[in-house]
């Protein structure tokens, strides 16, 4: 695991038996501090490979470091084995993406996102989790078009045609039902979902320079889609 601010890396996994999400242990010379934030442990770094600050942006720099000089990453980590720290750390989502429902319940976006992508088997290319200050969790699904075409039995169709096809919508409902069966409460239950009928824009900040989606910007840029998820009268695009 690494970021621009910890060039070239912060943690490294070198032991056999690696798996998705395994980050390993801090590189030599780097201090890792785990700070409780929003019910998780935020990774904070201090060392010679950590940048000193943002160029000519003193206010942003001040916010990026804590009182002990550790860089605050916004990444949540957890131990592979709490009794043996040498086994390394596991990525536990982005704290900056997490939010509270209007009940005060924390929603951990990274966990829900990974679960829905896994359950989607190609239909769900990615997903934006919604629900900040709302009663329930919603999802804006970025569709895997090849999977949509296969399910719908169509080739060369437009995005709008594919995501509105009954067979594709039915498959999304099955995914929601499967996840609901594993839910432990409002913090893990996705009640409504809608396919994104728009193409993600790099220019509008919806895709990061690393190729991942920017949840916050997608929600900000498409308020009409979020509004449909929480409307009293549900339209036909909502699953």
State where each predicted segment sits.
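Flexible glycine-/small-residue-rich
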Residues: 34-36, 45-47, 93, 141-143
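A structural signal for short hydrophobic beta-strand segments in well-ordered beta-sheet cores
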Residues: 32-34, 75-79, 129
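C-terminal boundary motif of the adenylate-forming
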Residues: 76, 119-147, 180
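Adenylate-forming
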Residues: 50, 84-115, 148-166, 186-187, ...
């Amino acid at each position: 695991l690494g970021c621009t601010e910890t060039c070239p890396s912060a943690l490294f996994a070198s032991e056999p038996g690696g798996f998705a999400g395994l980050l390993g242990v801090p590189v030599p010379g780097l201090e890792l501090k785990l700070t409780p934030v929003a019910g998780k442990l935020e990774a904070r770094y201090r060392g010679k490979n950590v940048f000193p600050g943002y160029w000519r942006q003193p206010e942003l720099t001040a916010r990026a470091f804590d009182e002990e000089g550790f860089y605050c990453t916004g990444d949540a980590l957890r131990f592979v084995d709490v009794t043996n720290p040498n086994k390394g750390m596991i990525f536990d989502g982005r704290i900056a993406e997490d939010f509270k429902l209007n009940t005060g319940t924390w929603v951990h976006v990274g966990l829900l996102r990974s679960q829905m992508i896994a359950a989607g088997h190609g239909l769900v290319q990615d997903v934006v989790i919604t629900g900040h200050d709302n009663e329930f969790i919603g999802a804006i699904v970025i569709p895997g078009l090849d999977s949509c075409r296969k399910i719908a039995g169509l080739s060369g169709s437009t995005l709008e045609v594919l995501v509105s096809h009954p067979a594709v919508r039915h498959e999304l409902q099955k995914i929601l039902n499967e996840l609901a069966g594993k839910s432990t409460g409002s913090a893990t239950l996705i009640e409504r979902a809608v396919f994104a009928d728009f193409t993600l824009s790099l220019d509008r900040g919806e895709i990061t320079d690393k190729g991942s989606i920017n949840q916050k910007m997608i929600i900000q840029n498409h308020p009409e889609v979020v509004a449909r998820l929480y409307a009293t009268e549900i339209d036909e695009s909502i699953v």
